[in-house]
Amino acid sequence: MDIYIKKAIIHQFSPDDTELFLADKFLNITPKIEEYLRKKIERVYSDEAKTGIFEEENPFFNHITDDLLETSVTLANLWKEEFSISENLKTNDLVFVQFSKEGVEHFAFLRIALRETLTHLGGEVDNPIKLTQNNLPGFGTGADEALVVNLQSRKYHLIEKRIKYNGTFLNYFSENLLAVAPKISPKKSIKELEKTARRIAESFNTDDFQFQSKVKSAIFNNLEESNELSPEKLANDLFDNNLTARLSFIDQVKEAVPEPVQFDEIDASRQLKKFENQKLSLSNGIELIVPNNVYQDAESVEFIQNDNGTYSILIKNIEDIQSK
């Protein structure tokens, strides 16, 4: 991912008086600062990101200008108005970034909750371990909330967390601050696909381990082949001999996932890794991990249902066995 950090500014929100401490200067983009911001932005392009496209007249989008200082102050104040109602307020850094990705201008807004951390102070003899406040999380940790916007296409990627207010949980970031209705994340969409497939299979008394393995294989194969999941194609793969089940699956899936699950600009590697193997836990304590391509090959693995209702698993053509 070719990301070039141009400018960044950081403001701070204090929970004590719900005030903002506004900076008036940009960050000095040292190599380490550049790496830190770049990694935070890269993590937004994950399977947990909600996506959408801002309408041209969207008020939030129209606050984003070339003047990063003015933009950041305006958006920080708008954010504070919506976030301050939360019942669990913490000190947060609000980071605003101008950057280019693959040569296209982008904007990022990162909310990073600061942590308490134990620090070893080498010069202290009697008490070298101190509890320090307002520490940024490490390089490998994502922002608590993040918005990345392609300023050319108006497409956005959003990582958001709900806040609790009057006993209810609110998607304050998307609903109130951005005033948008994003698509649900690929990760959540896939969970909906799995859940719906099992529900349909249960209604036809076919939800056994073989069907669940079939679901995993279908998701893996479709992701690997086309980098997207189409409800219609999955329905054909899962319920090829049952028209009623196919139509029911498509109708029920589209209530939660109205469009194909696409991984455009989003890293699908975590989902591919999740579904690349079949994991079976047997009643006798044996656990098997079988790669999908082997699992689907009758010359390698065969499942036999015995007359007494039990199963036997025949593993064939093994050239070598190693103990690990």
Identify the function of each model-found stretch:
Residues 238-324:
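C-terminal structured domains
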